[in-house]
């Protein structure tokens, strides 16, 4: 991409050979007009305006005023996939102009409530054969570029970059109310000015010993950076001096593109992914955009987050790592004895067929990941119908408990007809006293449920006997109506029935005589 630009600069160097102290103010205007084909945005006009206030102390120099006008025909700009790189050479007059081409129109405004303004500071170094001034004189000018980006124009005095020996405070404004300050190192001895730079929504300039690095985003604006000048030699001698960038934070997910990425110069120093600072003065022409602007990888899977089963399979698939795995198992002092035993078993049986017996504790890993590299697969059993085991039935009998017959089904059989071959119920063998209480019940004194079952069956037997006896007694009473003995016999027979009903209400441990109850 070619860029047709005309640069018109008015310079006023005012060294004074008189012993008087003088103050001069020089205004610099730089107007760059661009063709519609040079930018993607369209027709743009950029006005670069700089105001320089020089306090000249008493010295013995000549007073020289020079007005230089230079035309730069077709300054070549190479555009990468995310930035525009200004190519420059040493010992030549190069002016770096960085803009942020995110808005459709770029216009300058001096009103406070008008369009928002971005101020970007950069240096121009003047020495070489193409300038009318002397080669030994170096003059650094601070140009302020007005571009629309900030909602409020923060009025901060921006002076020229001087070559004095005092430290300079540089404040880079990334958002209204948020700024980072740093201290620039000493430069060549000369006029001592205080230097402040205001920069927002654009990357810095790499020229003449001072480099602004592209530092990713703060909360609202795409840049937040702190600048240090690591060059201790004069700026006109060492052009590609580097700087250190502090507190570099990688750019994380952005829903919108970053405006400052669009126009990025080649940086002098790079910041590694681990956050360590690196500074090298000879890397000016060797950096690419991929080295400068790299987004970190987003952890979106289990394998990237470290929850995969590679570490588990590591000790099982490779036999050469038996010793390392054994050492790893011995170092786990806080682990349980079962876990350590399992690890030792894995390390000792790696050459043979290993059956996986560990339990998968991760929710997003499958059995295929765990069994990858193992010869036998995990043992799998289908769901089967479980049958009840053979249980011993408790019986209220004099004989010991007998084992129940094993059945192939879960549900018990219902036999409506009485089986003749089956033995009689052992309840009949229970001894009862006169009051209806049991004196000898094998196993009944221990289990109250068995005692209740025996009492219930005993009552059923008595009820059956009472139902059969009254029929016989009624026949006898018809034959001998004067006989009153059957009535007395009935009362005596009903009395044990009442005592049995009363015994159900009170347990066997609280046995009471029937006479006391009545």
UniProtKB/Swiss-Prot annotation:
Gene Ontology cellular component list: plasma membrane
**Pfam families the record matches:** GRIN_C
Q: Which domain of life is it from?
A: Eukaryota
Ranges where the record places region Disordered = 1-23, 467-500
Tell me the Gene Ontology biological-process terms attached to this UniProt entry: neuron projection development
* Biased amino acid composition, Basic and acidic residues: 476-494
InterPro entries per UniProt? GPRIN2-like/GPRIN3, GRIN_C
Q: What does this protein do?
A: May be involved in neurite outgrowth.
The protein's assembly and partners: May interact with GNAO1.
- Mind telling me what this protein is named? GRIN2-like protein
Q: Which organism is it from?
A: Gallus gallus (Chicken)
């Amino acid at each position: 991409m070619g860029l047709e630009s005309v640069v018109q600069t008015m310079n006023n160097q005012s060294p004074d050979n008189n012993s008087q102290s003088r103050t001069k103010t020089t205004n610099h205007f730089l107007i760059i007009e661009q063709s519609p084909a040079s930018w993607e945005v369209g027709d743009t006009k950029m006005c670069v305006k700089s105001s320089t206030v020089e306090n000249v102390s008493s010295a013995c120099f000549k007073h020289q005023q020079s007005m230089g006008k230079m035309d730069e025909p077709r300054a070549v700009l190479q555009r990468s996939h995310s930035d525009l790189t200004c190519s420059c050479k040493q010992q030549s007059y190069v002016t770096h102009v960085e803009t942020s081409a995110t808005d459709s129109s770029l216009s300058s405004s001096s009103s406070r409530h008008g369009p928002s303004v971005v101020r970007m500071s950069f240096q121009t170094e003047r020495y070489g054969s193409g300038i009318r001034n002397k080669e030994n004189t170096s003059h650094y000018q601070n140009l302020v570029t007005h571009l629309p980006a900030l909602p409020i124009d923060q009025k901060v005095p921006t002076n020229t970059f001087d070559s004095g020996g005092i430290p300079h405070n540089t404040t880079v404004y990334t958002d209204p109310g948020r700024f980072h300050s740093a201290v620039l190192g000493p430069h060549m001895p000369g006029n001592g000015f205080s230097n402040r730079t205001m920069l927002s929504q654009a990357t810095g300039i790499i020229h003449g010993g001072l480099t602004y690095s592209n530092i990713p985003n703060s909360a609202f604006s795409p840049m937040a950076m702190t600048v240090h000048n690591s060059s201790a030699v004069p700026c006109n001698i060492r052009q590609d001096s580097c700087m250190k960038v502090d507190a570099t934070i990688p750019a994380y997910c952005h829903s919108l593109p970053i405006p400052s990425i669009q126009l990025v110069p080649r940086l002098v120093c790079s910041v590694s992914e681990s956050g360590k600072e690196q500074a090298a003065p000879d890397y000016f022409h060797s950096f690419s955009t991929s080295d400068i602007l790299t987004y970190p990888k987003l952890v979106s899977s289990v394998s990237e987050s470290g929850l995969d089963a590679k570490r588990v399979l590591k000790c099982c698939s490779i036999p050469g790592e038996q010793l390392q795995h054994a050492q790893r198992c011995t170092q786990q002092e806080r682990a349980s004895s079962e876990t350590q035993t399992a690890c030792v078993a894995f390390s000792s049986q790696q050459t043979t067929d290993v059956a996986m017996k560990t339990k998968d504790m991760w929710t997003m890993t499958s059995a295929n990941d765990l069994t990858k590299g193992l010869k036998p697969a995990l043992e799998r059993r289908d769901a089967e119908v479980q049958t009840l085991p053979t249980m011993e039935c408790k019986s209220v009998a004099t004989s010991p408990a007998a084992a129940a017959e094993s059945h192939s089904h879960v549900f018990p059989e219902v036999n409506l007809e009485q089986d003749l071959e089956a033995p009689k119920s052992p309840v009949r063998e229970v001894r009862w006293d006169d009051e209806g209480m049991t004196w000898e019940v094998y196993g009944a004194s221990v289990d109250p449920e068995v005692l209740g079952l025996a009492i219930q069956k005993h009552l059923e037997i008595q009820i059956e006997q009472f139902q059969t006896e009254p029929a016989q007694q009624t026949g006898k009473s018809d034959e001998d109506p004067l006989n009153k003995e059957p009535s007395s016999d009935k009362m005596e027979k009903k009395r044990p029935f009442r005592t049995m009903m009363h015994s159900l209400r009170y347990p066997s441990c609280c046995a009471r005589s029937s006479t006391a109850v009545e």
